[in-house]
Swiss-Prot record:
Recorded name of the encoding gene: rrp41
Biological process terms in GO annotation: gene expression; rRNA catabolic process
Protein's name in the database: Exosome complex component Rrp41
EC number(s) reported in the record: 3.1.13.-
Family membership: Belongs to the RNase PH family. Rrp41 subfamily.
Compositionally biased region (Basic and acidic residues): 249-259, 383-400, 472-493
Location in the cell: Cytoplasm
Amino acid sequence: MSNKPENLTLITDDGLRLDGRRADEIRPMKIEVGVLSRADGSCYLEWGRNKILVGVFGPREAHPRRSQRADSAVIRYRYNMASFSVEDRARPGPSRRSIEISKVSREAFEPVIMAELFPKTAIDIFVEVLQADAGTRTAAINASSIALADAGIPMKGLITSCAFGKVDGKIVLDLNKEEDNYGEADFPVAMTQDGEITLIQMDGNLTPDEIKQGLELVKKGCKEILEIQQAVLRKKFETPVEEVSEETAPEKGAEKEVLEPSPVAAIVEETPEEAEEPEVEISEEVEAEILASEVIPDFEDELEEEIEEELEESEEDLETEEEEFEEEALEEEAEPEEDLEEDLEEDLGEELEEEEEELEEEEFEEEALEEETELEASLECAPELKEFDEIEARLEKEDASIEAEEEIEPEAEEATEEGLEEEAEIEETAASEEENIEAEAEAEEEAEPEVEAEEISTEAEEAEEEPEEEKSEGPWKVVKDPSEAGTRGEKDE
C-alpha cells in the first residue's frame, strides 16, 4: 500500500466510493460455467474489472507416483497471473506471491473437498488471472468453487470469499484497485456456506473493533456471493419439466418461458459509470449469443492453449525434478555400491586365489594319479619293474636317512670322531691279539702236553673269580675284558 495523493478522495462526504458503491456493497459479478470443453470442470468469472478463468482436472492418477496418498486424493492448486493482466507486463512463471496464494487457496478448499473418497489420485485446480483489479485471490476462490462443482467433485459445501479493508479511516467491503493501492488495510476472508472460516489474512493495521465490524460486512458479502453461485449452478443443472398435454404451441412456449430460471441473480447490474450510457433492450437469447460470441470465443482458444502450455511446462518441471531425484538416489546408492564392489573384489580375489590353489592341487594330484596309473600299467606289462620299485623305495629310505643325517651332522661330527678313535684302538687291540694268537698257536704246537695243565689252572682261576663277582656291592656288574675272553676261548680251543 503506497501513499495516497493529496487531491485523491476515496470516499465522499455522502459515503460514496469512487465507483459509486456504498461501504457495504460488493462489485457486480458475472459467472459462466463450463466454458472449457477439455476440462472436467471450468468457470469464467468477472468481478468488477477482474477476469478469472479456472479449469479443474480430476480426480486422475497422481504423477509423480511418490506424491500419491494412500488414504486420500492430493489437491493441487495453481494460481497464475497472465503477463497482460496488469498495466506493467508481469513476468511469466511462478513468483513468491503466486506460490503463497496457491498455498492458502488450497488450504481453504481442503476442509470441504471429500478427498478421502479418491485415494491415490490428484485433483488439479488451475487459475488464470486474465485481468487484475484488486481482490484476485478472493475472485479466484469463488470461481474455483464453481469449477469444482461443475467437475462433480464431492464437497461438503461451496466456498465463498470476500475482503474488507480500511479506507480513509472507514471499514469498507470489497476493495477496488485504488482502495487497495492507497488504503490503510486489506483483510481477505474465505468461509463455507455454514459460516466456518477457512482462510483469513491481513495486510495493514486494524483494531479489534474494526476487525469485528469488517467480519460482519464479510458475512453479508459472502451471503450475496453464495446466492449468485447457487443460481448459476441451478441454471445449468436443473432441467425444465415439460408437461405432456394437448396445448397449443404458443401456450407451450409460454410455459417454457415461465420454467426457465431468471438470470438476474447471476448477472448483477453494472457500475453507475457504465449505467450512464444508453442501454438497448435485448432478449435473453440474443444476450446469450452475444456473450458466447464475444466473451467466450475471444478467450477460450487462447486460454486453453495457455493452460495446455502451462500444463506441459509443469509436467516437464515435474519430470526434471523426478530425474534429479532419481540421480540423487542413484548417487546415494552408488556410494555404498562402490564400497560393496571393493569388498566384493577383495572377496573375489581371495576366492580366486583359493580356487587357483585348489586347481593347482587338483592338477598335481591328477598328474600323480596319471603317473601311478602309468607305472601300474608298465608293471602289468613288465613284472621285472617290481625290483625297480623296491630299489626306488630303498633309495627313498636312504634319501630320508641322508636328510636325517644332514640334520644331525653338527651333533654327529663329534661322535664320528670319537668312534674313529675307538675303532683305531680296537684295530690295534685286534692286531695285538692276532700276534698273541699266533704266538700261542706256536707254543701249543710245541707244548701240547702242557694244555691239560693250563686248563686245570684256568678252571682254578675261574673258581677264584666267581666269588669276587658275588662280593661286588651295588647294582653295577663287572664287565670282563673281551680280550681276556678271546684268549681264554682260544686256550679252550
